[in-house]
Amino acid sequence: MDYEFLRDLTGQVLVRFSMGHEVIGHWLNEEIKGDLAKLDQIEAAAAEVKGSERQWQLDGHEYTLWLDGEEVMVRANQLDIEGDEMEEGMNYYDEESLCLCGLEDFLRVLQGYRNFIISK
């Protein structure tokens, strides 16, 4: 999972991820937007579920984050569309709408994101 942190002309932090993990970047850009308190909340929840059978979920406007003891899933809320609504033979391109990664890798990304924001 490759990624980079950037700043646009206004100083807003943007995150780009490699193919297969793009949704994590979209989630950070759309749902977190540099909110360190939200990062604190997610990291605390990760510490609670780590090594357990428990799960935790954070619903956002566009994306939902799920954590369990080993894995993280970021999923676009638009994927809640029922299969009945699809025309026969059609399926969704969801590579940029769904991502799974390990909890430790995800926490490293959040730490890098936090460090980049603080390092203005």
Swiss-Prot record:
- InterPro entries xref list: UPF0231
Residues of the signal peptide = none
Q: Which residues form a coiled coil?
A: none
Q: Fetch the Pfam families from UniProt.
A: UPF0231 (PF06062)
What transmembrane ranges does the database entry give? none
Q: What is the superkingdom listed in this entry's lineage?
A: Bacteria
* Stated family: Belongs to the UPF0231 family.
Matching NCBIfam families: PRK05248.1-1, PRK05248.1-3
Q: Which HAMAP family match?
A: UPF0231
State what protein this is by name. Answer: UPF0231 protein YE0706
Specify the species.
Yersinia enterocolitica serotype O:8 / biotype 1B (strain NCTC 13174 / 8081)
